[in-house]
Curated annotation (Swiss-Prot):
Gene Ontology cellular-component annotations: cytoplasm
InterPro entries for the chain: 14-3-3, 14-3-3_CS, 14-3-3_dom_sf, 14-3-3_domain
Top-level taxon: Eukaryota
Gene coding for it: TFT5
Pfam families documented for this protein: 14-3-3 (PF00244)
Annotated organism of origin: Solanum lycopersicum (Tomato)
Subunit structure: Homodimer.
Protein family according to the UniProt entry: Belongs to the 14-3-3 family.
Signal sequence region: none
GO biological process, one term: protein localization
Official protein name in the record: 14-3-3 protein 5
Amino acid sequence: MASPREENVYMANVADEAERYEEMVEFMEKVVAALNGEELTVEERNLLSVAYKNVIGARRASWRIISSIEQKEESRGNEDHVASIKKYRSQIENELTSICNGILKLLDSKLIGSAATGDSKVFYLKMKGDYYRYLAEFKTGTERKEAAENTLSAYKSAQDIANGELAPTHPIRLGLALNFSVFYYEILNSPDRACNLAKQAFDEAIAELDTLGEESYKDSTLIMQLLRDNLTLWTSDMQDDGTDEIKEPSKADNE
Protein backbone atom coordinates (compact mmCIF):
# COMPACT_ATOMS: atom_id res chain seq x y z
CA MET A 1 0.00 0.00 0.00
CA ALA A 2 1.27 3.48 -0.94
CA SER A 3 2.47 5.78 1.85
CA PRO A 4 0.70 9.16 2.31
CA ARG A 5 3.75 10.82 0.73
CA GLU A 6 3.62 8.56 -2.35
CA GLU A 7 -0.14 9.07 -2.61
CA ASN A 8 0.22 12.87 -2.53
CA VAL A 9 3.00 12.78 -5.14
CA TYR A 10 0.82 10.55 -7.34
CA MET A 11 -2.15 12.93 -6.95
CA ALA A 12 0.09 15.93 -7.70
CA ASN A 13 1.01 14.23 -11.00
CA VAL A 14 -2.69 13.62 -11.72
CA ALA A 15 -3.53 17.27 -10.93
CA ASP A 16 -0.68 18.34 -13.23
CA GLU A 17 -2.10 16.24 -16.09
CA ALA A 18 -5.54 17.74 -15.43
CA GLU A 19 -4.06 21.27 -15.25
CA ARG A 20 -5.58 21.80 -11.79
CA TYR A 21 -2.60 23.63 -10.38
CA GLU A 22 -4.14 25.01 -7.16
CA GLU A 23 -4.81 21.41 -6.08
CA MET A 24 -1.37 20.35 -7.30
CA VAL A 25 0.06 22.97 -4.90
CA GLU A 26 -2.05 21.55 -2.06
CA PHE A 27 -0.83 17.98 -2.67
CA MET A 28 2.81 19.10 -2.76
CA GLU A 29 2.38 21.27 0.34
CA LYS A 30 1.25 18.12 2.18
CA VAL A 31 4.42 16.35 1.02
CA VAL A 32 6.60 19.23 2.26
CA ALA A 33 4.69 19.58 5.57
CA ALA A 34 5.36 15.90 6.37
CA LEU A 35 9.13 16.25 5.90
CA ASN A 36 11.15 15.73 9.05
CA GLY A 37 14.60 16.97 8.10
CA GLU A 38 14.86 14.89 4.93
CA GLU A 39 15.00 16.24 1.37
CA LEU A 40 12.46 16.15 -1.42
CA THR A 41 13.43 13.91 -4.32
CA VAL A 42 14.26 15.59 -7.66
CA GLU A 43 10.81 14.54 -8.96
CA GLU A 44 9.08 16.01 -5.89
CA ARG A 45 10.93 19.32 -5.99
CA ASN A 46 10.17 19.66 -9.72
CA LEU A 47 6.47 18.98 -9.07
CA LEU A 48 6.44 21.66 -6.36
CA SER A 49 8.12 24.11 -8.73
CA VAL A 50 5.71 23.37 -11.61
CA ALA A 51 2.66 23.69 -9.34
CA TYR A 52 3.64 27.09 -7.99
CA LYS A 53 4.95 28.29 -11.37
CA ASN A 54 1.52 27.75 -12.94
CA VAL A 55 -0.48 29.19 -10.03
CA ILE A 56 1.65 32.35 -9.92
CA GLY A 57 2.10 32.56 -13.70
CA ALA A 58 -1.62 32.87 -14.42
CA ARG A 59 -1.95 35.76 -11.98
CA ARG A 60 1.22 37.52 -13.15
CA ALA A 61 -0.17 37.43 -16.69
CA SER A 62 -3.53 38.80 -15.46
CA TRP A 63 -1.78 41.57 -13.53
CA ARG A 64 0.19 42.66 -16.61
CA ILE A 65 -2.95 42.78 -18.79
CA ILE A 66 -4.96 44.71 -16.18
CA SER A 67 -2.09 47.18 -15.60
CA SER A 68 -1.93 47.79 -19.35
CA ILE A 69 -5.70 48.45 -19.52
CA GLU A 70 -5.40 50.75 -16.49
CA GLN A 71 -2.70 52.83 -18.23
CA LYS A 72 -4.85 53.14 -21.37
CA GLU A 73 -7.89 54.25 -19.37
CA GLU A 74 -5.77 56.78 -17.44
CA SER A 75 -4.43 58.25 -20.69
CA ARG A 76 -8.01 58.61 -21.94
CA GLY A 77 -9.07 60.31 -18.70
CA ASN A 78 -11.71 57.67 -17.84
CA GLU A 79 -11.53 58.16 -14.07
CA ASP A 80 -14.50 55.89 -13.23
CA HIS A 81 -12.97 53.00 -15.15
CA VAL A 82 -9.56 53.64 -13.61
CA ALA A 83 -11.01 53.44 -10.07
CA SER A 84 -12.70 50.10 -10.83
CA ILE A 85 -9.58 48.67 -12.46
CA LYS A 86 -7.35 49.75 -9.54
CA LYS A 87 -9.65 47.87 -7.17
CA TYR A 88 -9.51 44.78 -9.41
CA ARG A 89 -5.71 45.01 -9.70
CA SER A 90 -5.47 45.23 -5.92
CA GLN A 91 -7.43 41.96 -5.62
CA ILE A 92 -4.94 40.20 -7.93
CA GLU A 93 -2.02 41.70 -6.01
CA ASN A 94 -3.44 40.23 -2.79
CA GLU A 95 -3.56 36.80 -4.47
CA LEU A 96 0.02 37.20 -5.75
CA THR A 97 1.22 38.21 -2.28
CA SER A 98 -0.49 35.22 -0.66
CA ILE A 99 0.99 32.73 -3.17
CA CYS A 100 4.51 34.18 -2.88
CA ASN A 101 4.36 34.21 0.92
CA GLY A 102 3.17 30.58 0.88
CA ILE A 103 6.13 29.20 -1.08
CA LEU A 104 8.64 31.51 0.65
CA LYS A 105 7.50 30.16 4.02
CA LEU A 106 8.00 26.55 2.82
CA LEU A 107 11.45 27.39 1.45
CA ASP A 108 12.60 29.06 4.67
CA SER A 109 11.02 26.64 7.15
CA LYS A 110 11.52 23.29 5.41
CA LEU A 111 13.46 23.20 2.15
CA ILE A 112 16.56 25.40 2.15
CA GLY A 113 17.80 24.22 5.56
CA SER A 114 17.54 20.53 4.69
CA ALA A 115 19.13 20.83 1.22
CA ALA A 116 22.26 18.67 1.26
CA THR A 117 23.55 18.83 -2.32
CA GLY A 118 24.82 21.78 -4.35
CA ASP A 119 22.12 21.50 -6.97
CA SER A 120 19.26 21.36 -4.43
CA LYS A 121 20.66 24.33 -2.48
CA VAL A 122 20.91 26.39 -5.68
CA PHE A 123 17.46 25.19 -6.83
CA TYR A 124 15.75 26.38 -3.63
CA LEU A 125 17.71 29.64 -3.26
CA LYS A 126 16.95 30.45 -6.91
CA MET A 127 13.29 29.72 -6.21
CA LYS A 128 13.42 32.04 -3.18
CA GLY A 129 14.89 34.78 -5.38
CA ASP A 130 12.25 34.18 -8.05
CA TYR A 131 9.29 34.61 -5.68
CA TYR A 132 10.73 37.73 -4.06
CA ARG A 133 11.26 39.04 -7.62
CA TYR A 134 7.58 38.43 -8.38
CA LEU A 135 6.71 40.50 -5.29
CA ALA A 136 9.05 43.27 -6.47
CA GLU A 137 7.22 43.36 -9.83
CA PHE A 138 4.11 44.93 -8.32
CA LYS A 139 4.96 46.18 -4.82
CA THR A 140 5.79 49.88 -4.35
CA GLY A 141 7.83 51.99 -1.94
CA THR A 142 9.53 50.26 0.98
CA GLU A 143 7.82 46.93 0.22
CA ARG A 144 9.34 46.91 -3.27
CA LYS A 145 12.76 47.88 -1.89
CA GLU A 146 12.59 45.07 0.67
CA ALA A 147 11.47 42.50 -1.93
CA ALA A 148 14.30 43.58 -4.28
CA GLU A 149 16.89 43.32 -1.48
CA ASN A 150 15.66 39.82 -0.58
CA THR A 151 15.77 38.80 -4.25
CA LEU A 152 19.35 40.02 -4.60
CA SER A 153 20.42 38.26 -1.40
CA ALA A 154 18.87 34.91 -2.43
CA TYR A 155 20.26 35.03 -5.98
CA LYS A 156 23.75 35.98 -4.71
CA SER A 157 23.76 33.10 -2.20
CA ALA A 158 22.66 30.73 -4.97
CA GLN A 159 25.30 32.11 -7.34
CA ASP A 160 28.12 31.60 -4.81
CA ILE A 161 27.19 27.92 -4.43
CA ALA A 162 26.54 27.41 -8.16
CA ASN A 163 29.91 28.87 -9.18
CA GLY A 164 31.69 26.62 -6.69
CA GLU A 165 29.77 23.36 -7.10
CA LEU A 166 27.92 23.24 -10.45
CA ALA A 167 29.38 23.10 -13.95
CA PRO A 168 28.81 26.18 -16.18
CA THR A 169 26.59 23.97 -18.37
CA HIS A 170 24.41 22.74 -15.47
CA PRO A 171 20.77 23.67 -16.24
CA ILE A 172 20.14 24.93 -12.68
CA ARG A 173 23.23 27.19 -12.78
CA LEU A 174 22.20 28.48 -16.22
CA GLY A 175 18.59 29.03 -15.09
CA LEU A 176 19.86 31.01 -12.12
CA ALA A 177 22.04 33.22 -14.36
CA LEU A 178 19.06 33.78 -16.67
CA ASN A 179 16.69 34.84 -13.87
CA PHE A 180 19.33 36.86 -12.01
CA SER A 181 20.06 38.82 -15.20
CA VAL A 182 16.31 39.41 -15.74
CA PHE A 183 16.17 40.77 -12.18
CA TYR A 184 18.98 43.24 -12.90
CA TYR A 185 17.25 44.36 -16.10
CA GLU A 186 13.58 44.45 -15.08
CA ILE A 187 13.68 45.28 -11.36
CA LEU A 188 16.97 47.13 -10.74
CA ASN A 189 17.03 48.84 -14.17
CA SER A 190 20.69 47.86 -14.60
CA PRO A 191 20.97 46.81 -18.27
CA ASP A 192 24.79 46.72 -18.23
CA ARG A 193 24.91 44.34 -15.26
CA ALA A 194 22.13 42.22 -16.80
CA CYS A 195 24.01 41.90 -20.09
CA ASN A 196 27.35 41.18 -18.41
CA LEU A 197 25.88 38.43 -16.25
CA ALA A 198 23.97 36.81 -19.15
CA LYS A 199 26.95 37.02 -21.52
CA GLN A 200 29.39 35.56 -18.99
CA ALA A 201 27.06 32.62 -18.24
CA PHE A 202 26.53 32.00 -21.97
CA ASP A 203 30.25 32.20 -22.83
CA GLU A 204 31.28 29.92 -19.94
CA ALA A 205 28.69 27.33 -20.98
CA ILE A 206 29.69 27.48 -24.67
CA ALA A 207 33.32 26.81 -23.69
CA GLU A 208 32.28 23.55 -21.99
CA LEU A 209 29.46 22.47 -24.29
CA ASP A 210 31.30 19.30 -25.36
CA THR A 211 31.25 18.03 -21.75
CA LEU A 212 27.42 18.08 -21.60
CA GLY A 213 25.74 14.75 -20.93
CA GLU A 214 22.82 13.72 -23.11
CA GLU A 215 20.32 13.94 -20.23
CA SER A 216 20.81 17.68 -19.64
CA TYR A 217 21.82 18.75 -23.17
CA LYS A 218 18.30 19.79 -24.17
CA ASP A 219 17.60 21.72 -20.93
CA SER A 220 20.96 23.50 -20.97
CA THR A 221 20.88 24.52 -24.63
CA LEU A 222 17.30 25.80 -24.27
CA ILE A 223 18.34 28.12 -21.41
CA MET A 224 21.43 29.20 -23.36
CA GLN A 225 19.11 30.19 -26.22
CA LEU A 226 16.99 32.25 -23.78
CA LEU A 227 20.15 33.98 -22.50
CA ARG A 228 21.09 34.83 -26.08
CA ASP A 229 17.54 36.02 -26.91
CA ASN A 230 17.60 38.37 -23.91
CA LEU A 231 21.03 39.73 -24.83
CA THR A 232 19.74 40.51 -28.34
CA LEU A 233 16.58 42.12 -26.93
CA TRP A 234 18.36 44.15 -24.27
CA THR A 235 21.12 45.51 -26.51
CA SER A 236 18.47 46.55 -29.04
CA ASP A 237 16.37 48.19 -26.26
CA MET A 238 19.42 50.10 -25.02
CA GLN A 239 20.06 51.43 -28.53
CA ASP A 240 16.37 52.35 -29.01
CA ASP A 241 15.98 54.07 -25.63
CA GLY A 242 13.75 57.10 -25.75
CA THR A 243 11.14 55.53 -28.01
CA ASP A 244 7.57 55.03 -26.83
CA GLU A 245 7.07 51.57 -28.27
CA ILE A 246 5.94 48.76 -25.97
CA LYS A 247 8.95 46.69 -24.98
CA GLU A 248 8.95 42.92 -25.40
CA PRO A 249 9.27 41.25 -21.97
CA SER A 250 12.51 39.47 -21.05
CA LYS A 251 12.50 35.69 -21.03
CA ALA A 252 13.12 33.91 -17.73
CA ASP A 253 13.53 30.27 -16.80
CA ASN A 254 10.50 28.28 -15.59
CA GLU A 255 8.03 31.06 -16.43
